[in-house]
Amino acid sequence: MKKAIALLLLTYFSGLAHAGEDAVDCDNAMNTLEINHCAALELESAQVELDKYLAASFEHNAEDTELVGAIKVAQESWKAYMTTHCDSVYTQWRDGSIRGLMALSCKTKLTKQRTHEVWENFLTYMDSTPPVLPEPKLME
């Protein structure tokens, strides 16, 4: 009986994992799997935006190779910080089903903050010249 239940659950979870993004209505996510799936999508979107802003900062400052190198080093250090910090958030909530959501939310928040910092420091001007890219939104 236990094997049958385990097989049924495995089949269900596998199907949910392969169902694709359209299978989950993130505005009405109802269970931990759906909520975590939607949080992962939000993190992925934030990461894509960060990558876009980093690429623009590299291109915008291409003539200053020292600056581009420094941004890249800072980005690697930031990634290490974000990972270890959000891993500690996961550990804080390790005994609850909310642990995954808390860690994903932590990563999303820090990623959006990092995107804003990249924009503010490397894609804007001190005068009234419009920025290279629009100001990214922080988490609400």
Stretch-by-stretch model annotation:
Residues 8-9, 120:
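A periodicity- and composition-biased signal for non-globular, repetitive helical segments
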Residues 18-140:
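N-terminal alpha-helical modules
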Residues 1-4:
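Positively charged n-region of N-terminal signal peptides that target proteins for export
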Residues 12-16:
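N-terminal signal peptide c-region/cleavage motif recognized by signal peptidases
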